[in-house]
Amino acid sequence: MASLAAAVFVLPKFSLALPDSPLGEKYDLTGSEAVGNTWGGTYQIGESGVLNIFGGGILTVTYGQNNWNTLTNNGVINIGAKDSAGTLIVDSPNSFTPGWAAVVGGSGTVNIGEMGSLTFTGYIPSYWWTSVHIGNMNIAGAVSVIPSAGVDSYFRVDNLTVRESGSFDSGAMHLSAQNGVWDIYGGGISAPKLRVASGEMTVNLRGENLLENLRAISIDSNTGTTVKMNVFADNIIQNLEFNANSVIEFSISRGSRLIINNFLTKDNNNVWQAENVEAVFYDYSNGSFFIGNDYWIQDNRLYIPAVDTYVTLTAYDGEGGLLSGEWSFEWNEQLNLNELVLTVPEPAAFAAALGAFALAFALRGRARR
């Protein structure tokens, strides 16, 4: 009986060739190994730990709960390389009642080489919070999410780079980011929505049409969020949802165009109207920003009648000088969209208007004498 009790209360032990957890050194995985199990257990990669999955190596992470992490990475995981295959699979074979911890978590870095793949499959906890959190992820290979059922939870990546050879397909799983930088060179991103939390986020679009398979970018918080978008080629955003107290900054390279098909507020407990919202354009030039036809310019601001919301428009030139003028829309028949246009008074016309005003003021002063 005593031996049975001891067996019941023994902690889960990983039967694998990996060094004991936490990993605090470099380890090359070239065979087929596994961590985790369906009832619990955590494998940790410490800040000084480096796990290399090369030479056809496969690591399978199995879990059956998310009350705590199954894999925690605060170091570096390298999956595959340009000339060497590597695979990391995260799988839950059965459903379970969700907890509140990320299955894979940590502030470390995951690098997926050209012949590398990271796959999440099976049951993924479905709840309105983060079930995967990777601090830094660089993708030259493939990242795929293939859930066995619908998913409401988020795949959070704070700092992301997707190379020309890379692809990030999250399937039906929402993406999430906070206080980081996303550099997208190619391959693109496929997801229902990118949810942006409070703080500041930068998105660099370094190729054409990189977000055409991302259905929406949504600013979740109304406590103050800044999203910076640096656009280096023609790109389309299907839906851009913003909240109150949001600032959206655009820097669009000369000759490039950014199209936003739908520019709307986020549903905030059935309150759609948003206040204190600003769109800021740096190195602004006409012919660079286009949106749909359900918008007006009113009081020199962008007005969205469907949600009775005003967006302050601010523009700067290439030297950082504030551009003052009149905003308007011009219909672009080729794109079937509105082009946002800023008409800035010519210096000569401005000087003449200033001179006329000064003369009128002087004559008015004489008439009073």
Kindly give the residue locations of the regions a language model identified.
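Extracellular/surface-exposed low-complexity segments
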Residues: 9, 14-37, 41, 205, ...
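Extended, solvent-exposed polar beta/coil surface segments
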Residues: 53-54, 61-62, 68, 80
